[in-house]
């Protein structure tokens, strides 16, 4: 019995239970799954006028039509069960394109069809898996070794792919468990701002019915990461409590020497044919240089290093910073503290999403494990809703006149919508509205989800301070206008060293060339964000210019990068080469295009200073590409762009 037949059997075992689940599930993915199974477009054509967008809250299917969709889905599944049929052929490219456009209210071009076929695993059970083109028994894989630095999403993805290919590897992780940033961040309210059914690997598990919320909290994400590592038996391939300090290339042996401090503080080394860094960008906290911070006598800690031994209940708490971490932590602790004083340098644009706090319905969870193609179409919708459906609106319109507040007509309309939300939430409080309104276009900085931030600001025990901080004394914070704010606890929600890629890791390539000398303090560049000339057999996940500043899922980026890296390693091994190294001209040409494209994006606006930029104002973290463009660039490894020795 195939996996498809097992799902059909599970779905139809109790037709009444199936009907109940359909009645309480997200209906458009159900409808798309029905079309996929039946090739009957009539209901989708009828429903199209009621679909205003990819988000479920932009869909208003009438009850009578919904009932017919549910009944038709039950009937088609029962027919499959009665005849014991296997999965139908994948719809044609034209049919898929039609389904996609009707399911999200248009905008999907034919270029997206191969991308979504891979992302939804319609072409193959695991669309991004890389397989050998030669008999692996002839390749002497046992003598190869890969070191992966980092045990978060990137490291786990690389390890799974290497394991599938039979290439020996070792993961070196500085923490004492898998999880990366999701292990380190545990502040109150910590969670994703990407829908969970997108914030997971496309290949595992299939489907994934486990999420309880549409935007899950930290513990659920961490459990997913660690259970994935367990499912692929990665614990035995990993050393924890390891701080990698140096990675040095030896030209004579064409191997990398990886030096690290172990859990006992002793220095060790390990040799590797290839190195993959998966250290992330948001994992090295920034401690602000505020006069007197070191003299403060109360608890003071970064949000990414939350001290759970400190009880904030009934205390006077200060949060310095108003980024994503503060946006989640502040509303979570505000009801229980004596007072909460928020020190804001610049206000953020905050978008309301009606699904943000909603649970995944029981019907949706039930169907994810039983209705064929339901999870695939749900993933498609979320990918379109969070990213590709609006990426084009983040490019500057050269004919747009008022670029101080917006960069094009769509951006201006979004600004008006966000301002309406601010005014409604702050109930006409003009002082707060002025303080909370950014002076730059939407998406100039990372767009945040409203976690009750504005409602928090309306609480009588919460104050928003927009003056700068002059100094911190033993028991208080002093603002630049001289006002004293006594506080019992200080939370530093002050971000990370996002522009200092790989810091503080020392990487030395050919002729002892230091990567830190090539990049300087914070001017990282890499081909595809993955690899750099003079550093053969060295690859990065989540490298320079790969942060998704507009939305989507970083896991999508990671999967694209890892698939590309696996192809590079495969090419090197199959050609019996020792090294693979990107040509300098290819690297340089790509980065010129990166800079040109970034200059057209909203986050390069003159009024914006964000963590994507380095100290000179160059964007080093954010990707200017749509997901489609990046997927096209990383889909196939081009040997002619590389030198092999």
Can you annotate each of these PLM segments?
Residues 1-83, 148-238, 344-345, 425-426:
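Beta1-alpha1 glycine-rich phosphate/pyrophosphate-binding loop at the start
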């Amino acid at each position: 019995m195939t996996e498809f037949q097992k799902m059909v059997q599970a779905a139809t075992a109790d037709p009444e239970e199936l009907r109940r689940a359909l009645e309480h599930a997200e209906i458009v993915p159900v409808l798309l799954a029905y079309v996929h199974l039946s090739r009957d477009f009539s209901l989708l054509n009828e429903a199209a006028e009621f679909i205003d967008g990819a988000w479920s809250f932009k869909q208003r299917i009438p009850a009578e039509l919904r009932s017919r969709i549910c009944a038709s889905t039950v009937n088609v599944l029962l027919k499959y069960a009665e005849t014991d049929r296997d999965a139908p052929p994948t719809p044609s490219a034209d049919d898929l394109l039609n389904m996609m456009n009707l399911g999200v209210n248009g905008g999907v071009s034919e270029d997206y069809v191969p991308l979504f076929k891979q992302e939804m695993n319609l072409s193959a059970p695991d669309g991004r898996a890389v397989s050998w083109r030669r008999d692996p028994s002839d390749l002497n894989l046992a003598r190869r070794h890969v070191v992966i630095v980092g045990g978060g999403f990137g490291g786990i993805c690389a390890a799974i792919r290497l394991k599938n290919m039979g290439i020996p590897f070792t993961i070196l992780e500085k923490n004492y468990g898998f999880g990366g940033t999701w292990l380190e961040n545990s502040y109150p309210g910590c969670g994703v701002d990407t829908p969970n059914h997108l914030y997971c690997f496309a290949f595992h598990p299939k489907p994934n019915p486990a999420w309880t919320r549409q935007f899950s909290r930290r513990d659920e994400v961490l459990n997913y990461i660690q259970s994935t590592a367990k499912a692929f038996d990665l614990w035995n391939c990993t050393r924890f409590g390891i701080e990698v300090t140096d990675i040095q290339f030896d030209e004579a042996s064409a191997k990398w020497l990886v030096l690290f401090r172990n859990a006992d503080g002793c220095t060790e080394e390990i040799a590797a044919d290839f190195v993959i860094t998966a250290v992330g960008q948001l994992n090295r906290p920034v401690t602000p240089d505020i006069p007197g911070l070191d003299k403060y006598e109360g608890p003071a800690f970064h949000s990414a290093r939350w001290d759970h031994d400190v009880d904030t209940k009934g205390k006077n708490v200060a949060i310095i910073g108003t980024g994503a971490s503060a946006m989640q932590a502040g509303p979570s602790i505000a009801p229980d503290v004596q007072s909460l004083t928020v020190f804001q340098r610049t206000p953020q644009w905050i978008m309301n999403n009606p699904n943000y706090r909603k649970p995944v319905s029981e019907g949706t969870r039930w169907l994810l494990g039983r209705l064929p193609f339901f999870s695939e179409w749900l993933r498609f919708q979320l990918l379109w809703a969070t990213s590709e459906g609006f990426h084009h609106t983040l490019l500057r319109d050269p004919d747009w006149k008022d670029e101080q507040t917006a960069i094009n007509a769509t951006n201006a309309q979004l600004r008006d919508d966000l301002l309406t939300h601010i005014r409604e939430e702050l109930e006409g409080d003009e002082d707060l509205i002025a303080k909370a309104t950014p002076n730059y276009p939407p998406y100039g900085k990372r767009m945040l989800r409203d976690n009750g931030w504005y409602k928090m600001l309306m609480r009588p025990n919460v104050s928003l301070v927009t003056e700068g901080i002059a100094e911190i004394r033993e028991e208080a914070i002093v603002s630049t206008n001289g006002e004293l704010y006594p506080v019992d606890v200080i939370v530093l929600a002050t971000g990370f060293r996002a522009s200092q890629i790989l810091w503080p890791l020392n990487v030395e390539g050919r002729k002892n060339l230091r990567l830190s000398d090539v990049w300087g303090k914070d001017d990282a560049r890499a081909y595809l964000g993955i690899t750099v000339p003079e550093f053969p057999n060295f690859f990065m996940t989540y490298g320079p210019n790969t942060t998704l500043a507009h939305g989507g899922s970083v896991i999508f980026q990671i999967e694209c990068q890892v698939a590309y890296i696996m192809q590079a390693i495969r090419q090197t091994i199959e050609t019996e080469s020792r090294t693979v190294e990107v040509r300098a001209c290819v690297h340089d040409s790509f980065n010129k295009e990166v800079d040109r494209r970034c200059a057209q994006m909203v986050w390069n606006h003159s009024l914006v200073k964000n963590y994507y930029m380095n100290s000179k104002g160059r964007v080093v973290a954010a990707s200017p590409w749509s997901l489609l463009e990046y997927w096209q660039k990383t889909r196939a490894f081009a040997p002619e762009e590389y030198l092999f020795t």
